[in-house]
Structures are given as structure tokens and as C-alpha cells.
UniProtKB/Swiss-Prot annotation:
The keyword Cytoplasm applies. This is Ribosome-binding factor A. HAMAP family: RbfA (MF_00003). The lineage of its organism: Bacteria, Pseudomonadati, Pseudomonadota, Alphaproteobacteria, Hyphomicrobiales. It comes from Beijerinckia indica subsp. indica (strain ATCC 9039 / DSM 1715 / NCIMB 8712). It is found in: Cytoplasm. It comes from the Bacteria. It holds the Pfam family RBFA.
Amino acid sequence: MSRAHHQQGGAPSQRMLRVAELIRHTLSDLLSRSIVNDPVLEGHVITVPDVRMSPDLKLATAFVMPLGGKDINSVIEALDRHKKFLRSEIAQRIHLRFAPDIRFKADESFDYGDKIDALLASPQVRRDLDATHTETQKAAD
């Protein structure tokens, strides 16, 4: 069995991480240069914070977010319409045995970060943090 078979449930390999970063960088470059002619994409600045590769390197999941977070569904639909073009451009710029199929998903890490910030700002957590801080100061004295 190959090493990739063992890593399906575990952490990504160095090769997966390296290829994902190359694809992320190339995709960001393509979207920032407005190479794709689509009115929806031209009206947005799109960030690509993360790309994840399958163990066989044949599938890339690109997490995208338009600046401001508005119209995410229309942006993903537009990217899906131009998936073949983007795949061919990536294949020309990155020399791999196979050009990976690309899936686009909304990046929800910003929403998750906002939820964590809201939890940390809640009165119950503030009270607990203040109590812990007071106890730490008393122990230090």
C-alpha cells in the first residue's frame, strides 16, 4: 500500500500541501488579473484563503470569499461556469502529471472567527476570565 492510502484520515502530506499552495497562488493570480471574462467576477475582488487537495492530487477544493462577503453564491456559480478555463490555465502554469479538477466552496472561516469573537465578548466568558485573572494575581502576590 502506498503512503497516500494511509493518510486519507490523517494530516495532509507535504506534497499535498505544496501542490495546494501552488494552486492557491495561481488561482489568486488569475482572479486578481481579471483573466476570466465574467461580469459577476469583474465586479468583485475575490480572495482564495485556502485550497485543499485530495490524497491522489486529482481534486482541489478551493475556498473562496469575495471581499466584503457579499454575493458569495453568485460568485461561486460564476467560478463553476469557468471551471474548465481555470483548470486549463492552472495546468499551463503548474506542471503536474494530472491537472486537478477544481471545486469551489465558500470560505466560512471568517464566520467561524466572528462566532468565536462573539463568544469571547459574552458577559459569562468575561466574568470567568476576570475571575481567573484575579485569582492569578492573588497567587502571584
